[in-house]
Amino acid sequence: MKRPTITDAQMDLLAERLSAAGVGRRGFLKVAAGLAALGAAGFNARTVSAAPKLAPGEKLAREQHLRYGGGGWIANDPSSHDFNKDLYCGGVAALWAGLMKFNADFQPVPYVAEKVSSNAEGSVWTFTIRKDSKWSDGSPCTAKDFEWSWKRQMDPASKNPYSAFFYDIKGAEPFNKSKVPDASRVGVVAKGDWTLEVTLEGPRGYFPVLAGYLAAVPAHRPSVEKHGDKWTEAANLVCNGPFTLETWEHNKVLVLRKNKHFFGAKDVTLDKVTIPIIPVQSGVLPYENNELDMTALQTGDLRRLRDAPATKGQVFRYPFPGTWYLTPQVTKPPFDNVKVRRAVGHAIDRDNVVRVADGFAVPAHSMIPPGFPGAVDDKKIRDIQRFDPKAAMAMLKGTPYEGGRNWPKVALTMRDEGLGSKPLAEAVQAVLLEHLNMRTELEVLEPRVFRAGLWGHNYQLVWIRWFMDYPDPHNEYFDTFYGKKTEGKRQAWVNDAFDKELEAGRDTRDTKKRLVHYARAEELMQMDGGYIPVAWVTRWAAVKPHVRGLEKNKQGEFVVDGNIYFDTFPNVYLVDKA
């Protein structure tokens, strides 16, 4: 088979991405020469070594033991550590290594795969597995393990609620929905031990992003078959990540140990990580008592630690992929009128609304938060729903609600949850009343009831948050708002031009061109009032001065573990306390 040639534009794109990862022109030429196909341009940049970079006079602590948790980080006992079967098991991500992982800028880079390539259109992807990839028992972790694990996730017998994550793979959906008898037609095939070939339903330029998602980590087949649902207990677990599970004392503590068989073990400095399972209501007290080296912060604790001279330098904000927004139901008055939907967008005083969040939210003007792939910062788009009370009232001219009168009864419906959701919703109610004279009744529903009504398009106006699953605009736009979805659709709103931009973004191989389609989609959705962005979620943490190695993104912010980035423990190290 003849390999396609690399164009100048593709070479420039590759050079740009490698430069962002710290690779110079000479290094770029070496990497480019080794690419198996131009389809992988941009995905083969390797992360830098995690080896400690000590300051002059600084010494590594003799005991490399990190105490981590509290403030909402692993506040409840995990149901398992089996992300392959249950994405939201609440387990420890550092036990696992996927084919790809995400760097501090949420870009996919090779991990267990040493190289990734594709055909010209991006419909067939090939992952070359590194030959030093091993399980924690020392046995090889191969392409066959990934084939078995991914098909296990799709298997209807697994009853995996998140199996649709793999529906881009050819044959995955019919297999998962029991429309075919077995997995033989699923487009995941190990070509020997070290090559995994994945055939998709069509061009999917973002597929390496999916391969880096936590749901794509492998499971150890012998352990699963021997121990069943108990295979991730500490005594049974065989994993392939930088750490192993030494102890799991349920509802009390998790203890991790460095995995000596991990292919990157030489760059992992920590020997031990202790994660006590601490309820959120315990606050920051364990950190203040020097029982923790690193912790998440809640509202009251944030103010106190940030204001105290002894701790203010330990507090930092970190990027979090979450957005609060409103979805007006276009089938229900008064939101069946686009002028009303646009008026609501102009009536939201976002600066005022986020004040109730005490630093845990910032005003949003689009779906994707800054610092994440696909984020849009375009004045034209920012102006579509800018706060402008006069423009809001002007939008109502010619409608039955001109002058802010004759509003029907309006319910603002939300899910019952923490995370500062209700105060923000109440702040939205206040600004709608102030600037549109629209009185709303807040309806708070149990999550299961809320979800059923959401998918049934039963609510007039919905207050909802979206936490990004994987860092690609396909997730924020296609998975959330695509009008042709047959299930799991959150709103009745449909816009054909919007859908066409999403389809083009999905099917386009070139990264820059894809982002243009998604920016157009954002503009179309806001112009039509398909949704109203209100606030981006922010999170805060504190870290002791002797903890080093946290990675920073291009915005200069520390990045910590979540469901996207999970590289904190391999990078962190401790120095002698002053």
Regions found by a protein language model. Give the residues of each.
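Gly/Pro-rich hinge or "lid" segments in bacterial periplasmic/extracellular proteins
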Residues: 103-107, 172-174, 178-179, 183-185, ...
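Extracytoplasmic/peripheral linker and loop segments enriched in polar/acidic and small residues
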Residues: 186-189, 354, 385, 438-455, ...
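Ligand/substrate-recognition segments at binding pockets and active sites
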Residues: 68, 250, 397-468, 511, ...
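N-terminal secretory signal peptides
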Residues: 1-27
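N-terminal lobe/hinge region of extracytoplasmic solute-binding protein
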Residues: 67-121, 236-239
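Structural transition elements
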Residues: 335, 362-399, 416-423
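Long beta-strand-rich cores associated with HINT superfamily self-processing modules
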Residues: 543-578
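Extracellular/periplasmic solute-recognition and catalytic clefts
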Residues: 246-257, 274-332, 355-356, 362
